[in-house]
Structure formats: C-alpha cells, structure tokens
Swiss-Prot record:
Pfam families listed in its UniProt record: DUF1720, EH, WH2
Domain EF-hand: 201-236, 491-526
Listed GO biological process terms: endocytosis; endosomal transport
UniProt-recorded name of the protein: Actin cytoskeleton-regulatory complex protein pan1
Keyword Transmembrane: no
Ranges annotated as biased composition (Acidic residues): 1154-1165
Superkingdom of the source species: Eukaryota
Skewed-composition ranges (Polar residues): 50-75, 129-139, 305-314, 340-370, 1171-1182
Length: 1467
C-alpha cells in the first residue's frame, strides 16, 4: 500500500521551515579549509562535550581525551566535514602502514549559517560501545548534569485483537502508529494525512475514509481508528466499495478500544527522573521501541522538531554551549537499526547560536541526526583520513560482530544494512486466510548484502514460520506443505528443486526446523540476487546434522580401531588367553582417565551374585569337612533387618501372589482350550466345506478337462520336448554330411559323364607326375595314343574319334559344374539353417506353453505343499490324500460313464448295418482312447491302433493279405482292459462307500442335523458284456464258424467301404454346391458393392453441388432475415402508433361524454378521430397478412425444420470451434451437435476445416470430430438427410413470402435441380413398393409450389402428426456392416423390385416419393439392405445413365410382393 518512496525523500520535507530538502542539504565534506578547527597541542585529543559554544569564532573545544603528540585525528564512525583538498585526495592517497586509532570525534569548525537546534523527546537507548568510549562519557558528564526532562508515559496500546484485520496486519499497524506518534496516544490530522496520501487514493475517497475512521470527531486518530483507516484504504485499493456506514460490530470494537485508551491516559504526568549521560546497562542491548518498521516497507515519518520542542523544555547548562566537534548539518545516514536518541544541547532561545547547527550527539556507534526526521536510507561508506593533510579511506558503517564461534548457527548478528524485505517475506509466507485467492511477489526482491550464515533475526523469523505451519507439532513439514510455502516466494521451479535438494540431504521428503531455516535462507538469498549453490557451505549445515554425522563418524572410527586392535593382538582367536575384554578400553564413556572408569557400562556385563541383597543360605557352599563359613555381611544385615514375623508375612504374601498367578494360569489355560476347541471345530467345518466343493468339482460335467493340464503331463511333455530338441543338432549334422556326400557324388558323376562324352579330353589323361599331376610327357603319350586310335578306327572302317580337347575346356566344364553343385549345396545349407531356427523357435514356443503361468519358487512350494502334502501336519496330509483319492475315484467313474455312453452311441449308430454289432468293442476302444480324460499312453495306443486298422482296411481293399500279428489281438486287449476298468471301478466304489461311512460317522459324532442327508451313490450300470463265444462242438463246426466269421467280416468291410464311398460322394456334392453358392453370393456382393460405390459417387457429387447452393441460399436467407427484422421493426412501430391512437380515441370519447353541449362538439370529434382511426385500420391488416406467408406451406416448414437444423449445424460448429476457447462450451456444443446429426455423414471437407482442427485443443473434441467425419458405409437415406437440407426452410419463417415462387423456379432451372427426385427414388425405392408414375404426375401439380426438388426428405415428418413413427423422431439406425459382411437374404421373400426411374430433368418436378414407415430396429438402411441379384446391375447402369443426362421412359411396375419393413405415407 505504501510502495512509493518519493514522499519520504522530498514531499514532506519541503514544507518544513528553515531546512532545505533532504537531497539538497550541504554535504558534510564541503566546509572551507580556513574554518576547520585546529586542536590545541596539549597532548590530548579534543573530545565532544555535548554543548554548543556561545560564539563559534572565540570559543574552541575543550582539550580532553588522549595525548596526540604523534597521533592525528581519524574519522571513526560518522566523520565530520573534510576540506575540499581532502576530498580530492580520497582516491589516490595510500595510508601509512600503522594508523593510530582514536575514539571520539575530530574538532570541526562551525559554519556561519543559522540553524535552529532541534530537540528530541525519544528515550535514550544505548548500543554496545568500546570501554574507552564509556569511560570518556563518564568524564564528559562529570562536571555538569543536565536537568532531567519530563518522562513520557509512552504510547500504550491495549492487547485487544481486532476482528476485521489479521493479527499480522494489526502488529504492523501498531508499529507504524508508534513510530508516527511517539509517546502520544493520538495521531493528529496532518500526520494522518501524510500517511493516508501514500496510498495514492483520490481525495474524495480519503475524505470518506477519514469521516468513517474519526469516530470521536476530535480531529485526531486513536490506534483503533488508525487501524480502521488502514483497513478501509486496503478495501478501496483492492477494488471494493467503501461502506456508507460502519458495521455495528466494527464500530463497537473501535469505540470500545478507544474508550479503554482514553481511560488509561493520566490527567497529569509525573516528574521524570533526571537524565544523565551515563548509559543504561539494564536495558536490552538491541531494544528499540521507537525504531521504524523493517526496511522492506517504507518507513513512516519521524516526529518533527517543532513537536519535540513543544514537548521538551530547554535545559540551561550554566554556561554557554560549547562546540561539540561534530559535523554540522550532518545528513541523515542512519538505517533501520539506529538505537540512540540525540541529546539536547544549549539554550534554544540564545541569540549566540546563530552560528550553530543542530548537533547530533550520543554514543558513536549509531548517532542520530536531529536535522531530519524522515526515513533513513541505508548507510553509505564514510571517508576517513588523517588530519588535514591525509586523505580518508572508504569505510562502511560499523557492522555488528558475531559473538560466537565463526560459522556457528544463530550467533551471527544482522549486517549493518539490515535484512531488507525479510518482514515482507515473512508476511507473504505466513498461513493466513485467503492466500489461495492469489498473491503477489512484488517487494520481495532486492539486492542487499546477505551473509552465508543464518543470522539471529532470520532464525527467529524462520522458526516462527515453521511453528505457524506445523500446527500439529509434528516437528517437521511435509513435501506438500513445503511446496505451498516455497511456491509463494515466486521463484522458478528449478531453483526451488535445487533448494529442496540442498535442504533435505537425507532425502526424507520432509524438513525439520533447521532444514526449513536452510531452505528459507537460500530462498531469501535468491530473492536478493545470489545464486543457489551447488552444495551447502559449512555455515549452512544444520548443527543437528553436523553433530549427528560427527557422532556417526566417531562411532565408526571407534569400531574400526577396535577391530584392528583385536585383529592385531589375536584376541579374535584366543579370547581365553588374555582374560580381559578389549571393549573395556574403548568404552563409549571415555578412556581410563574418565571419571566413570570404575563403573561398568554396556560394553561388558557379568552378573555379580555376591552383590545380591537378602537372605542366602550358605549350606550349598560348604567345602569338604570345613566349618560352616560365615554368611556375607549383606546377608547378616538382611537377617538383622527382617524379623521372623516379617519373613512369615512376606512368605504369606508370596503364597498369595503365587496362588493368584496359578489362578490366572488356570484361567488362561481354560481360555486357550476353548479357543483350541473352537479352532478345531472351524477347521473341521472348513474341511467339510472343502470336501463338498471338491465333490462338486469332481462331479461337474467339465471336470474331465481339468486333468488335461496337470503338472505330471506337463513335465513328461517337457522331457520329450527336450529329448527331441537334443536330436535336432544330430539330425542337422547328418543332413549336412549327406549333402556333402551328394555333392561329391554329383561331381564324380559329372566327371564320368564328361569323360564318356569327351573321351579324348585332356581331363582323362592320367598324370604320372608328383601328386598325380599331368606332365608334358603324359600329354605327348595321350596325343600319340589318340592318333593311334584314330588310325586304327580308320583302318577298321569305324568313325574317327573326336580330336583331343584342350585343357581349358575340360577345366571350364568342371568348374561350371562345381559352381552349380556348390550353389545347390549352399541353398540346401540355408534351408537347413532355416529349419533349425524354426525348430528352435517352435521349441521355445512349446516350452513357454508348457510352463505354468506365474511359476515361481514360492508358488511351486505352495503347490507342492497343498497338492503333494509336503511339509504339512499329519491331519492335513491325510485330508489332502483323502481328497486326491476321491478325485481319482470320481475321474475313473466319469471315464467309465463316458466310455459306456460312447459305446452305446456307436452301437445305436451301427444298428442299421447288419453284422456290425459284434465289432462294436473295437471302435469303442478307439473312441475311448481318444477321450480327453485318458492318459498319454492310452491316447498313443489308440492312435496306433487306428492307424493299423486303416492300413489293414486299405490293404484289404487293395486285395492284399494283412500282416498277422502273433501278439495279443485287439479283442483280447479290449477284454483285458475291460476287466481292468471294472476292477478300478469296483475299488473306486469301495473307497466311495468307505468315505461316505466316515462322513456319516463324523456327522453323527458332531450331532449336526442335516435336512437332506446325501444318499449313497447308486451303482453305475455295468458295461455290456463282451460277445459270447460259441462253444466248440467239433472241428468241423469250428471251421464252419470261422469261415462264416470271415465272410461276415468281408461283407461288413465291403458294406462299410460302400457307405464311406457314398458318404464321400455326398460330401463332395454338398461341398460343390456350397462352393457354387458362396461364389454366387460373392459375385452378387461384388455387384452390389459396385452399385453402392456408384451411388456413393453420385451422392458425393450432388452433395458438393448442394453445398454450393447452400452457400448462395445462406446469403439470400441472411438478407431475407435482415429484411424480416426491418419489417418487424416497422410493424412494431405501427403497433405502437395503433396503441397511441387507441389511447387518444379513448380520451376523446371520455371528453365527449363529459361535454354537455351537443352543438358542434359531436361533429368535430369524429372529424379529428377519423384520420387516427384510419391509421390503425390500415396497420391492423399487416399482422393478419404477415403470418399468412408461412401458413401457405406449413408442411414444408415442419418438414424443413429438422433438416435445417442438421444442415446448418456444421457452419455453426465451425464458427464456435474457431472462436470459443471455453472447454465446457466445446463439450456442450459437441453433445448438441452429436444429437442433431444422428447418422454419420459423408465426409464433407467444407464443414470441418483444418483450421478448426488446429485451434481445438480438447482431445475429446477432436475424437468426436474424427468419429463424426469417419467415412463409414452408411445408408443412402441418412447420407441424404445429413448432407442435403432445404435451403429455403428458414425463409418460410420470414414475413415476406414473395421469394417462394421465384426460388422454386430458380431451383428447377439449375443443373442439379431435378437430381433430388432421382436421389429420393434411389434411396427409398428398395424400402417401399414404388408408386406408379401416373399417381406421381397427378400429385405434382398440387405440389408445384413446394420446392421438393431440393428437399425430397421434407415430407418425412408428416406421418408424425398421424401418430406413426417418423424418421427424424426415431433413434438413428445402427451403422450397416461393410458390403462383404452383408447377410444372405431369405430366398423365400422376393427382393423388392428396382425403383421407378424418375422423370428427366427438363420435365416438371414430380411429387416426393413416399417416405418409409416405422422401421423395426434391426432393419438396416436402404443402401445396405438385402441384395437384389437381378436388379443390381440394371440399377447401376440406370444410375450411370441418369448421371450422364439420359432421358428415362415411362415404365409400369407390377408389385408382386410387399416388404415387411416398408412403410406407407398416409395422404
């Protein structure tokens, strides 16, 4: 609120008489050289006496202080004026090596200017000084004691909390009020005006604030009134209006606090104690009750000199004031930590003080100037030097020195320049209501000099912040809270992350008090321009962390040293040899010299039985025949202390305690027994439930499939897979070896063939050289042999052999063949590698499939524990085994049932064929072997038997004798297996009976009444007995029987083969028929798809033309709307005139009734009224004519309204998408658009532009647009409804109805004007029986005024008035499937005939086709309806010819069928 500092610098001080502005005061170093005082050579440095001189030209300062024979005066603290020559030498003079130090102020001469000495009434508070200064102050004030000034009671503000401001604001306002009024209780109007003007509010607003704040109407403000004024200023600055009157609550609070302050002010002030120059050592060193607020806020104005002069009386000193040696007219150079008040000097009314200025006095650490009382800027560097010939050095203000160890926390004072903006940072980060509404970081940044270490003031502020945020006193602040606190500082997120990393070195995610102080100090440094360090300096490491780390390091070093010493001394190996504990020397308490060395600690403990007090018998410690040793003194003392009665009493008490303990133990044992019994009952109930669940699982029809995925079979298959995988490399090596052999054989075969084809080739020469090489002699011999063979052939009359080839031809042929063989070998090698890789991949896939999902060691352990009963108690083991036995029994029983049912089914299936019943066990065995519940070995055997049987059948069919196996026959094996199954079933039934008996006994013992006792399982029907064998009567009968059996088998085989062949033929015929039907359907679907694509292309072309028309019609419509609005305005004006005329007529009628005369007044009335009557008569016709235009075509309006909505939706959507940024508005508009456009349209690039997609950032909005614009196969009717709307539908609502006929004529003459009829006939021709063209022609004249050629769907809502379901009102049909997935039509229902061709474009527009009636939900749209095999090609050709402009001839359609889904339009 007080962000401007201009008012502190020049705005207020200009109004003070006798004092120039702050920036225009004469500098302290511009006094002439001749007027500078020269100290007297008396051996002492002149000291300030605190009094002004009577005459500056005659009196000199008194010589006091230290001898200065070899010393020159030096400016320490706030120096006086220096000559101009000294100022010019500031930058170039080098000080000597040894600079004598001098406390005090050098003598200064007084300028001849007149200044009024100012006095202050602020209480004196002394800051720390050196001992020499304190001694000098005693010597200076020893002679004369100034008269005591009156003591002020001070500004006392009651400790009352105001509810309309926060506690922080109230404390800030208290500081501001105290600094402004000093010891007074009220603030006068001028001071309040100065403070309120800093808010930069207009004068009218400040006047209202003053009227509301000055509740006492005294022209002065008490503190509650001042706080109220600040509160009202804040309201107005934040943009809220000022109340006209104060609320009662605020008014009562302010009035009550004002009364308390008024009653607490005494009538007369007591006489205060005399003020001396002796510092007050009892006051706190840093106490400053009159200091202004912290520098981060602009400091209020100090009281003026005139006010202090009016409060303080001048004190005579007995002689003329003396020169103090201080620089006159010294500028205000104090900061916020000035703690000393100036002293009054001299008589203020003396005329001799015309050469004196106001004197700043006090101790030298922080002297305060009295010439200016405004806000003090930070202290700039001061020049110092030696006397008049030495230049001064640039030094800053006296900074507070740390009083503790360097780098220690909390012992560093604030720098001399203070901590700017620290209070603002505190107020910003304090938890307060309304902070979520927004905050500003203005005023937090600065460029102050901040040390690394945390100062006392900072630590206190940060601790207060920590306690304020740690409301639950957890001792730490979590990450979420720290983010909220640190985020209010306005720093970058990366800087805050680095600060958090430095403040939380342990990565705990929370900060304690010291770590929070480190984080806040780093934030404060960053706000003042310091970078965030990469690692914490030693000054910022919290003491707790540093001490903890040191302690941990010390413990680690002790442990490591102890381990090394024990290792070196061998104490690890022979502890009994030393007999001492080395831990004793390294005790945590210290070394051998520590005070507690004699005491034992936790490093070594040994129980001392001797130290036990009480009675102890010595009979156990008698040694041999020695006398009984004396009891220890402790035992004697205990016996002496306790008498027999006391011992008996203790025994009784102990007995009582033991009995109580026994009773508790008995109770506990009973409770444990009850719990054990309850646990047993629960365990037994759980076991029963488990048995019942297991029985349900075993008896479930799908329980047989549960055995397919057991662990044993998986492991067996994995072992087989591993064995096969091990065989793969061996097989691959064998393949490669065979490939090599094949290649070598091919090469050798080629050599042989080549030698046979070229017998005289050089390749056939046998080499006799080393290594079988061919030499020149071998070639000569070969040529000689060839010549001899040629001569012999010539003599014998045989053909002469071919000449010998050269060496190159044979070699080339061999190389070519070798390359070909090598290429084939490499190709085969690549194939082998591919096969190996494929086998490996297949093996990996099989291994993954054979692995149990989620198989881990824990899962395997649990599975083996509860399935294999490993590591469980005996009861649980017996229970698991019982469940497994029951499961196996149920599995065997179910397997027998399945086999029996399969056998019965096969017998039932083979009954028609004679003689097959005796072979029924064989197929039953085969089918049973392939059951899922059988084992792997059974399935393998069954597969082998089936393969053998098929081989035998094929051999028998080929006339070959099958191989006779001397081993067990099929019938014998089946008999054996049947006996084994019967035995297993019998054992399973016995186990079931035993288990049921056990269960019944257990139920009887538990005395549980069950309503439905499960009955014993009924015995299963035994499988049919094997075919009985005929007894052998004699050998002849046996031969006949065997022969008859063979003939029967042969006949059965022949019949079976004939049946198989017939079945195969039937299957082939059925397959051919299905293939032909599928091919036919595919052709029909392809034709339908082509026709649909052609229709879609035509529709797209018409949609494009319709868009162009809509753009033009939109412009016409907007113009019509504008004209309609103008007409409506004119009509409104005419209605107003009518009303006024009516009112005038009524008034005139009243006047006529009041008139008593009947002469000329009756005639004059109608004469005046007639024009006014004519006006409403003419204008009243307009409202009746105006609605007549839409009445002429109500059907078109009703029909066009839904289409207008759908057609106009996309342009509005485009506008909204490009302009609106509101996500909620986008979502609402998207939902509305989705409801209006119910069916997906044909992709229309003009409706959704790329620009709209770019500007829309809502992902759901983009997804909805993509789904809306997705080009799916939809019906033609939804496409037409979406893309083509009546452009003149909106014009029907206007008052001007003259555009209907003209627009209709224009539509007829357009190139695509007649396309609507064609499109309507195409769309709805398959949905309803087409009407004859004669009927359409009859209806066309009556409908000529309606623009049907542009809106064929306009008549869709008409059936809605009759109660039938209309297309727009019905929910949108589901999207049709793609053409390839169209279901086959029902052949029993004839397809609808093709639509009647519409008239040519030049012909008059016919009436609209009848719309579809109420459609059932599963009915697809017209375009994706049942295909018409005969009409589809003609319709496609017809549509193509229509597109080319071909004229259509009139045809007569005979409606032979009526579609079940077609509707009818009621006229």
């Amino acid at each position: 609120m007080y962000s401007s500092s201009n008012s502190f610098l020049g705005g207020v001080n200009n109004a003070r008489p006798g004092q120039p502005p702050f920036m225009q005061q004469p500098p302290y170093s511009q006094l002439p050289q001749g007027q500078q005082q020269i100290p007297q050579q008396t051996g002492f440095q002149p000291q300030p006496t605190g009094y002004g001189s009577q005459s500056a030209s005659h009196l000199q300062p008194q010589p006091t202080g230290f001898p200065t024979g070899q010393l020159q005066p030096q400016f320490t603290g706030f120096p006086g004026a220096a000559p101009p020559q000294q100022q010019q030498q500031f930058g170039g003079y080098q000080a000597p090596a040894q600079q004598p130090q001098l406390t005090g102020y050098p003598p200064q001469s007084q300028p001849p200017s007149l200044q009024v000495p100012s006095t202050t009434g602020l209480p004196t508070r002394l800051a720390p000084r050196t001992s020499s200064e304190i001694a000098n102050s005693f010597s200076d004030g020893a002679g004369v004691a100034p008269p005591p000034p009156p003591k002020s009671s001070g500004s006392k503000i009651p400790n009352i909390r105001l509810s309309f401001i926060t506690a922080q604001d109230q404390a800030k306002f208290e500081q501001l009020f105290k600094s402004a009024v000093g010891d007074s209780q009220t603030m006068d109007g001028e001071k309040a005006k100065e403070l309120l003007l800093r808010s930069r509010l207009p004068g009218s607003e400040l006047s209202k604030i003053w009227v509301l704040s000055d509740t006492t109407k005294s022209g002065q403000l008490f503190f509650p009134e001042f706080a109220l004024a600040m509160y009202l200023c804040n309201l107005r600055i934040t943009g809220r209006e000022l109340p006209s009157t104060l609320p009662d609550k605020i008014k009562n609070e302010v009035s009550g606090m004002v009364d308390i302050i008024s009653f607490g002010v005494p009538d007369t002030e007591p006489q205060g104690a005399a003020r001396t120059n002796v510092p007050s050592f009892d006051a706190p060193l840093l106490e400053n009750k009159s200091a202004p607020p912290a520098p981060q806020h602009p400091k209020p104005q100090q009281p003026s000199n005139a006010q202090f002069l009016s409060q303080l009386a001048a004190q005579p000193t007995g002689f003329g004031p003396q020169a103090t040696g201080l620089q006159p007219n010294q500028p205000s150079l104090l900061g916020a930590n000035a703690t000393l008040a100036p002293q009054t000097t001299g008589f203020p009314g003396q005329s001799q003080q015309q050469y004196l200025h106001s004197q700043p006095t006090g101790l030298m650490t922080n002297p305060q100037a009295t010439g200016y009382n405004g806000p003090r800027p930070p202290l700039p560097p001061m020049p110092t030097g030696f006397g008049s010939n030495l230049s001064s050095m640039q030094t800053g203000g006296l900074a507070a020195q740390p009083t503790g160890i360097p780098g220690q926390w909390g012992f560093v004072n604030a720098p001399s320049s203070g901590l700017p903006n620290i209070e603002a940072l505190k107020q910003q980060l304090m938890p307060q209501p309304g902070r979520e509404g927004g905050f500003t970081t203005a005023g937090l940044s600065g460029n102050a000099s901040i040390p690394w270490a945390i100062t006392k003031e900072e630590k206190k502020i940060y601790d207060d912040l920590f306690r304020a945020w740690d409301g639950l006193h957890k001792g730490f602040i979590g990450g979420d809270t720290a983010i909220e606190i640190m985020g209010q500082s306005g720093l970058d997120r990366k800087d805050l992350e680095r600060i958090w990393t430095l403040a939380d070195p342990s990565n705990r995610g929370r900060l304690n008090m010291d770590e929070f102080a480190v984080a806040m100090h780093l934030i404060y440094r960053k706000l003042n321009g310091y970078p965030v360090p990469n690692r914490l300096p030693p000054e910022l490491i919290p003491p707790s962390t540093r001490n903890l780390n040191d302690s941990i390091g010390a413990v680690k070093s002790l442990l490591s040293q102890d381990a090394e010493s024990r290792k070196a001394s061998g104490a690890f190996l022979q502890p009994q040899k030393t007999g001492v504990s080395y831990l004793k020397e390294h005790s945590f308490r210290g070394g051998a010299r520590s005070p507690g060395f004699g005491r034992k600690d936790a490093t070594l403990f040994k129980n001392n039985d001797e130290a036990a007090a009480g009675y102890r018998s010595s009979a156990r410690r008698r040694v041999g025949n020695d006398a009984r040793p004396s009891s220890p003194p402790t035992s004697q003392a205990s016996e002496e202390e306790l008498s027999v009665e006391q011992l008996k009493k203790k025994i009784r008490e102990t007995q009582i305690m033991l009995d109580a303990v026994d009773f508790k133990d008995e109770n506990r044992a009973e409770e444990d027994e009850v719990l054990d019994r309850r646990d047993r009952l629960e365990a037994e109930s759980l076991m029963d439930r488990t048995r019942r669940v297991q029985d349900d699982i075993d008896t479930h029809p799908n329980a047989v499939f549960r055995k397919l995925d057991n662990g044993a079979e998986r492991r067996s298959l994995r072992r087989q897979l591993q064995a096969f995988e091990d065989q793969v490399p061996q097989i691959a090596s064998e393949v490669r070896r065979i490939e090599r052999e094949i290649a070598d054989a091919k090469l050798e075969l080629f050599r042989l063939k080549d030698a046979k084809a070229h017998p005289n080739s050089a390749a056939n020469i046998v080499g006799t050289g080393p290594g079988g090489t061919v030499t020149e002699a071998d070639r000569i011999k070969a040529r000689a042999r060839a010549r001899m063979q040629a001569r012999a052939a010539e003599l014998a009359g045989r053909p002469v052999p071919a000449s010998v080839d050269d060496d190159g031809a044979a070699v080339r042929r061999l190389e070519a063949e070798s390359a070909s063989i090598r290429a084939d070998r490499e190709k085969n090698e690549a194939m082998t590698r591919d096969v190996e890789e494929s086998v490996r991949e297949f093996t990996r896939s099989l291994e993954d499939s054979l692995k149990e999902e989620g198989e881990t060691s824990t899962r395997e352990h649990e599975r083996r524990r509860w399935e294999d009963a490993l590591g469980v108690e005996d009861v649980i083991r017996d229970f698991i085994y019982d469940l497994q036995r029951g499961s196996r029994t149920a599995h065997i029983r179910k397997e027998e049932e399945s086999r029996a049912s399969a056998q019965e089914q096969r017998l039932r299936h083979e009954e028609p064929s004679p003689g097959v019943s005796r072979l029924s066990p064989a197929p039953s065995a085969g089918s049973a072997g392939s059951l899922p519940g059988s084992t792997h070995e059974d399935r393998v055997a069954a597969a082998r038997e089936r393969a053998q049987r098929r081989i035998a059948e094929r051999m028998a069919a080929a006339g070959l004798k099958p191989h006779t196996d001397t081993s067990e026959t099929l019938l014998q094996r089946q008999e054996r297996e049947k006996r084994e199954r019967e035995e297993r079933l019998r054992r399973a039934e016995e186990e079931d009976a035993k288990r049921e008996q056990e269960r019944q006994r257990r139920l009887a013992e538990e005395q549980r009444s069950t309503s439905d006792t499960p009955a014993k399982p009924v015995g299963k029907k035994p499988p049919p007995a094997p075919p009985s064998r005929r007894g052998r009567t004699d050998s002849a009968g046996q031969a006949e029987v065997k022969k008859a059996a063979e003939e029967t088998i042969t006949a059965e085989q022949a019949a079976r083969e004939q049946a198989i062949r017939e079945e195969q033929q039937a299957q082939e015929e059925e397959t051919n028929r299905l293939e032909m039907e599928a091919q036919k359907r595919e052709e029909e679907l392809l034709k339908e798809k082509e026709a649909q694509e052609a229709r879609l292309r035509a529709l797209e072309e018409q949609v494009r033309q319709g868009k162009i028309r809509k753009q033009e019609e939109k412009r016409r419509k907007e113009e019509a709307e504008r004209l309609a609005k103008e007409k409506e305005a004119a009509l409104a004006a005419q209605r107003a005139e009518i009303e006024r005329a009516k009112e005038r007529e009524r008034q005139l009628q009243l006047e006529l009734e009041r008139l008593d005369e009947e002469s000329s007044s009756d005639d004059e009335g109608p004469v005046n009224i007639t024009p006014e009557d004519s006006t409403p008569t003419q204008s009243q016709l307009l409202p009746t004519v105006t609605p007549a235009a839409p009445v002429s075509a109500p059907e078109s309006e009703q029909a066009g309204s839904p289409e207008d909505t759908s057609s106009q939706a996309p342009p509005v959507d485009f506008k909204l998408e490009t302009e609106s940024k509101n996500p909620y508005f986008k979502i609402t508009h998207q939902a509305t658009d989705t409801q209006v456009v119910s069916s997906p349209p044909v992709p229309q690039p003009s409706f959704t532009s790329p620009k709209a997609d770019v500007h829309s950032t809502n992902p759901f909005h983009r997804l909805a647009k993509q789904e809306t614009s997705k080009p799916a196969f939809t019906g033609s009717a939804p496409l037409e409804r979406k893309s083509r709307a009546r452009p003149e539908a909106d014009d029907d609502w206007s008052a001007a109805g003259s555009e209907f006929d003209s627009s209709d004529d224009d539509d007829d003459e357009r190139p695509g004007g007649g396309s609507a009829k064609q499109l309507a006939s195409i769309l709805f021709g398959t949905m309803a029986p087409p009407r004859p063209l004669s009927a359409m022609d009859d209806k066309s004249p009556s409908k000529s005024s309606t623009p049907v050629q542009d809106s064929p769907v306009a008549s869709l809502p008409v059936p809605e008035s009759n109660g039938s379901l209309s297309a727009p009102a019905a929910p949108p049909p589901p999207p049709p499937p793609p053409p390839a997935a169209v279901p086959s039509y029902d052949p029993s229902v004839a397809p609808p005939p093709p639509p009647a061709p519409p008239m040519a474009p030049p012909a008059p527009p016919p009436g609209p086709p009848p719309p579809p009636g109420p459609l059932p939900p599963p009915a697809p749209p017209a375009a994706s309806g049942p295909p018409t095999p005969a009409g589809a090609p003609d319709r496609s050709a017809l549509l193509a010819s229509i597109q080319k402009g071909k004229g259509l001839r009139k045809v007569q359609t005979n409606d032979r069928s009526t579609s079940s889904i077609a509707g009818r339009v009621l006229d």
